[in-house]
Amino acid sequence: MRKVLRVKKNIKIARIVPLVLLLVACGRGEVTAQSSSGWDQLVYLFARAIQWLSFDGSIGVGIILFTLTIRLMLMPLFNMQIKSSQKMQDIQPELRELQRKYAGKDTQTRMKLAEESQALYKKYGVNPYASLLPLLIQMPVMIALFQALTRVSFLKTGTFLWVELAQHDHLYLLPVLAAVFTFLSTWLTNLAAKEKNVMMTVMIYVMPLMIFFMGFNLASGVVLYWTVSNAFQVVQLLLLNNPFKIIAERQRLANEEKERRLRERRARKKAMKRK
């Protein structure tokens, strides 16, 4: 019973924390050095860092460099999240089998399901909540960076290449690039999954469309951040968690298992003939 309650408690925490972060991040007023709240001070700190990285006064360059710096710092957490998610996907068939086996709603059955599930997690070295921690750490950082671009006045000015950072891109090239890299990052993330999640498959196409249409009206500085962040994620996936290599390795292991079983059958047939 304690394990069931602990699982429920962790699920509630996982749901509440993002909501709290969202409420904190909903401020729309301008952020200055005199802003009093701790959250606004973090936003302003990010803005000053971007300004410091803006070589020759180019805020666009500052946005790119700061985004890359943040993504590099968060890379170990991202890698942990991806690996944990992959492990959870690998054991989903066995988890579903347990859920079918212990389908009852009574307390004793639920306790048994929790115990068997914990044993399965231990067997494969999986922590079902490990993928949540990196996400919860990344969320406030990414939200603060987003708000630095929208709530601090000195980041709303300047140009980068063909765009005014405070205005939307009249050529719509940045929204297109942001949508393309968003599609690639979500597609690559889902590509190596053993079992395709319907919601994730839908998001592969919905997220890029949302980014594309939102990019029509948002300041180009924000869309530039989205573009660089998702482009970095694509490169990171290909280097550290290449789905094509994962699929190839999975296929190799499947072929080896198939060959092993074939050899065993042949050996049994030979043994029977000798008798």
Swiss-Prot record:
Q: Which family does it belong to?
A: Belongs to the OXA1/ALB3/YidC family. Type 2 subfamily.
- Tell me where it resides: Cell membrane
The main location class comes to membrane
Q: Does the keyword Metal-binding apply?
A: no
Lineage start: Bacteria, Bacillati, Bacillota, Bacilli, Lactobacillales
User: Cross-referenced InterPro entries, in alphabetical order?
Assistant: YidC/ALB3/OXA1/COX18, YidC/Oxa/ALB_C, YidC/YidC1/YidC2_Firmicutes, YidC_ALB_C
Residue positions bearing lipid (N-palmitoyl cysteine):
C26
Transmembrane region(s): 58-78, 129-149, 171-191, 198-216, 222-240
The record's section on HAMAP family has:
YidC_type2
Q: Membrane topology type, per the record?
A: Multi-pass membrane protein
Give each disulfide bond as a residue pair: none
Q: Which GO terms describe its cellular component?
A: plasma membrane
Q: Write out the entry's keywords from A to Z.
A: Cell membrane, Chaperone, Lipoprotein, Membrane, Palmitate, Protein transport, Signal, Transmembrane, Transmembrane helix, Transport
The leader peptide range reads 1-25
Q: Name one GO biological process term.
A: protein transport
A GO molecular-function annotation: membrane insertase activity
Q: What is this protein called?
A: Membrane protein insertase YidC 1
Q: Which domain of life is it from?
A: Bacteria
S-diacylglycerol cysteine lipid attachment residues:
C26
> Does Repeat count among this protein's keywords?
no
Q: What does this protein do?
A: Required for the insertion and/or proper folding and/or complex formation of integral membrane proteins into the membrane. Involved in integration of membrane proteins that insert both dependently and independently of the Sec translocase complex, as well as at least some lipoproteins.
